[in-house]
Amino acid sequence: MASSSSKASDSSSQRPKRPDQGPSGKDAAGLVALHGKLAQLKRQVQSTRLAAIKERVEANRKALQVHTCALFDVAAAAEVASRGAEGGNALSRGAAEGHRRFVGWDSASGPGERELVHVQEENLVAGTLVLSSSGGSGASHRTVVQLVKLPVVDKIPPYTTWIFLDKNQRMADDQSVGRRRIYYDPIVNEALICSESDDDVPEPEEEKHVFTEGEDQLIWKATQDHGLSREVLNVLCQFVDATPSEIEERSEVLFEKYEKQSQSSYKTDLQLFLDKTMDVALDSFDNLFCRRCLVFDCRLHGCSQNLVFPSEKQPYGHELDENKRPCGDQCYLRRREVYQDTCNDDRNACTTYNMDSRSSSLKVSATILSESEDSNRDEDNIKSTSIVETSRSKITNSEYADKSVTPPPGDASETENVSPDMPLRTLGRRKISKHASKSNDHSPDKRQKIYSSPFPFAMSVLNKQSVPEIGETCPDSIESAVDQLPSLDDPNKKISTKDMCAGSTTNTTENTLRDNNNNLFISNKEHSISHWSALERDLYLKGIEIFGKNSCLIARNLLSGLKTCMEVASYMYNNGAAMAKRPLSGKSILGDFAEAEQGYMEQDLVARTRICRRKGRARKLKYTWKSAGHPTVRKRIGDGKQWYTQYNPCGCQQMCGKDCACVENGTCCEKYCGCSKSCKNRFRGCHCAKSQCRSRQCPCFAASRECDPDVCRNCWVSCGDGSLGEPLARGDGYQCGNMKLLLKQQQRILLGKSDVAGWGAFIKNPVNRNDYLGEYTGELISHREADKRGKIYDRANSSFLFDLNEQYVLDAYRKGDKLKFANHSSNPNCYAKVMLVAGDHRVGIYAKDRIEASEELFYDYRYGPDQAPAWARRPEGSKKDEASVSHHRAHKVAR
C-alpha cells in the first residue's frame, strides 16, 4: 500500500509525457513487462479499494449504532415523562369522552327521553317551511321558518394564470407550443406527448465510460512509462472497459490535471487569479452582460451577444486636484502636503547657508535666491531656479515637439544635458517669473551650469516635481535623498547638504551623479512594474478610460484591496506620464504593457487632433430635423404602410459603407453601433425647444421614436439640480414628454369584470387626450410560432398576439401586464402605437380622448378583413358573414 502511494506520488511529480512523445512501437518483451505491471497495479488497486470499502462499512456501522442508541434513550425518556405526568394520557381521555358524548348519548339518556326532529313541508305560504319535533313524553312542537331567496349572481369568468412582465422577453427555446405538448386521449385513457416535427424526438446518446480512480492510475502509469502508442492502448483496453479513443482522451485530461497541480503547488489561488488577464477573467461576464439594457442575463436580447466596441472612446485627461480632499491615509494628496513642508524647510536651509558663504559660488546662490523670491510663494511647487529653469526647458522641448518645429540654435545648450530617461512632465499651471528669464538670458554660462548641476536634491526633486499632480513618493528630507544615492569615490563617503546647496563639484562628479540618478529612476520604474500583475494592469488601463488620470477614483473603484492610491499614482507617473510625452523607442523596460498603454494614449491624441485640426477649434455641425435619418422611410412606417424593421447594432469602424448591416436592413445607426458619431447613417436626435417633442416638428416623434437623453440635446433625465451637467430645472417644471416608455411613467390600471367579454382593464385616475397609459408587454415570438399559437387562441375565442415588426410578434397570453385585458371596440377610447425606444420596438397604449376615472379601456385591434373573430366584428355583420370568416391567426396591429 505504501509502495504504491509512493510510486504514484513520484510519477505525478514528474512532467507527464505527451501522447506524441512516446515511441511508435514496443517490442514483445516490453509489452509483456507492461502487461505484468498493469496486472500487478490492478491487483493493488483492487485490494486498496476493498480495504477502503471495509473501513467505510465499519465506520458507518459504528455511527449507526451510536445514532440508534441515542434515539432509544430519547424514546425511553419520553415514555417515563408521559407516565409521570398528572392525569394520565390526556389525548386518549379526551377522545374517549368525545366518543361517549356524541355517540353514546342515547345510552346515557333514558329510553323515553329521546327527542326526534321531523321536517314537514306544508303549503301554508310560499317561501315557508314547517319544522315539527316530538319528545319522549309525547309532546310535539311545530316551528314555521320563512325562507329568503338569494339573488342570482353571474358566474365569475374563467381566469388563466399569467406571469406579470414589466418588460418584453424573448421566448425560450423550449416554450414552443408544438414541442412536447401533452394531449389526453379519451379512448385509451392516457396522456400522450405529441410533437409536430420529428426533429424534436431525442436521439439515443451513446453511453460514455466513466473512469474510476483506479483506472486513472492504470492509464497514468502506462502513459508515463511507455508513452501512448497503439500497442499500449491495446494493452490498456484489456484492463479498462473503454475504447482506445476514450482512453486517449482521458490521458489528455489527466495530463492537464496533473500539469495544473504542479503549477499551482507553489502559487495561491489569488496569485493564479491575478496572473490572468481581464479578458480571461471577464469572459463569462462578457457573455452574460447586456450592453443595451445594462443588466446580466438579459431576457430581451439574450446572452452571448456580438460584442460591438465603439470606434471612438471617451477622451480622458488629468483632472485638477487643487480643491480635492485626500481619499484616505494612503492618498497621494497627503504625501503632497508632507512634500510641501519638506521643500520649504530645505529651501530655508539653503538660503541661510548661502548668506554665510564666502566662496565664488555666492553669485550663483544669490541668483537662485533672487529668482526664488520673485516666484509666487503660494504655489505648491519647488521654489528653486534650477527646478524652474529645467522645467522651462522641458516645456520648450515639448512645445517644439508638439509643433514639429526645430528649436533655435541658441537653445540647444539648454536641452543638451537633460537626461532622456527623465519624465517629460511640464508644469502646466506654474508661472515662470520674467526676472528669472531675463537674468538667465544675460548669463548663458551660468544657466548651463545650473542645468548640469549635479545636486542630488535638485535631481531627486525634479523626479518628484509631479507629486502635487500624481503623488510620487519623495524622501522626507534632503539627507534621506542623499543616503539613497551611492557615493562617488569612497563607499563610506556621503555628500553633505552644504555641498549640494553650493554646487561645488567637478564635471566628473556631475556626470556620475546624473547617471546614478537616472539608474535610480529606471530601477524604481522596474520595481514598480514588477509588482503589478496582468489583471491589475488591465484594471488600471480600464480605470484610465473611465475616470481619466485620477488615481483616487481608480484605486477606490477598480483596485480596492489590491493597490493603494499612492501606488496607483506612482505607477501612473512612472509608466503613463512619460509615454504620454515621448514615444517609446524599441523594446523598453515596460514591455508589451507599455505598448498597450501607448495605444490608448495615441488613440486619444488622434481623436482630439481630428476635432481640433482646423484653426484650433472644433466645428459644430448644424443639423436640422431633415437630417435626422431617413425621413421618407420613417414617415411611411409611422403611417402604418410598411413593416417596422428590427434593429441590430453594426460593428463598423469610423464611417459606415454599403456593407453596413444597418444600411442593408434600412435602419439608422444608433448609439450602440461601433461607428463614429459623425456617421451619415446615424440618427442624431432632436434639438427641440419647449413643448415640441410631442408634435410632428420633432424628428424623433415623427419617426415613431422616443427621445434619447444620450442623443437629443435638450432632453435630459435628472432631478434638475445640475449635478449631471444638464441645464438647471425650469421654473415651469418642463420635462420632455416623449420619454414615457423609457421612464415607465404609466398610469394606474385596474383589473375587473368587463361588460363586453371576460375581464377588462380600467383606468383609476382621469387622463387627457394623447396621455400615455402603459405598455403592452409579452413574449417576443417569431411569426411562424405566432401562426401556431394563433390557431389555438382562435378556438378559445381570445386574442393576445400583437404584430411588432417584421421579425417578432408580441404574445401576452402567458406573460404580460394588465393591459392585455383591454378589449376590442370599433369606437375605442385608446390607441396602440409602436415606438422605438433605445433601439427596441415597444407597444404603448395612449388615450384617444379624455377618459374619466374607472372607465374601461378599449382600443381597435385593427384586424384584417378576414381575420376578425365573431365578437370583434361590426354589429351589421350577418350570420352568413360570420360563417365565412376564416380561421387564420387574428393579430393586433398598431396604427
Curated annotation (Swiss-Prot):
Ribonucleoprotein as a keyword of this entry, yes or no, is no
Name the positions where S-adenosyl-L-methionine binds. Answer: Y861
Q: Where is this region: Disordered?
A: 1-28, 369-425, 485-508, 867-895
Domain of life from the UniProt record: Eukaryota
Extent of Basic residues compositional bias:
886-895
Q: Which UniProt keywords apply?
A: Chromatin regulator, Developmental protein, Differentiation, Flowering, Methyltransferase, Nucleus, S-adenosyl-L-methionine, Transcription, Transcription regulation, Transferase
UniProt-listed Enzyme Commission number(s): 2.1.1.356
> Which intervals carry biased composition (Low complexity)?
1-13
Catalysed reactions listed for this entry? L-lysyl(27)-[histone H3] + 3 S-adenosyl-L-methionine = N(6),N(6),N(6)-trimethyl-L-lysyl(27)-[histone H3] + 3 S-adenosyl-L-homocysteine + 3 H(+)
By its UniProt entry, which InterPro entries does this protein fall under? CXC_dom, EZH1/2-like, Hist-Lys_N-MeTrfase_plant, Pre-SET_CXC, SANT/Myb, SET_dom, SET_dom_sf, Tesmin/TSO1-like_CXC
What residues does the CXC domain cover? 628-732
Gene3D superfamilies (alphabetical): SET domain
Q: Which GO terms describe its molecular function?
A: chromatin binding; histone H3K27 methyltransferase activity; histone H3K27 trimethyltransferase activity; single-stranded RNA binding
One example of a Gene Ontology biological process annotation: methylation
Any single GO CC term annotated in Swiss-Prot or TrEMBL for this entry:
PcG protein complex
Family from the record: Belongs to the class V-like SAM-binding methyltransferase superfamily. Histone-lysine methyltransferase family. EZ subfamily.
What else is on record for this protein?
Down-regulation of EZ1 delays flowering in short day (SD), but has no effect in long day (LD).
Supply the name of the protein.
Histone-lysine N-methyltransferase EZ1
Question: Which species is listed as the source?
Answer: Oryza sativa subsp. japonica
What are the top taxonomic ranks of the organism? Eukaryota, Viridiplantae, Streptophyta, Embryophyta, Tracheophyta
**Which gene holds the coding sequence for this protein?**
EZ1
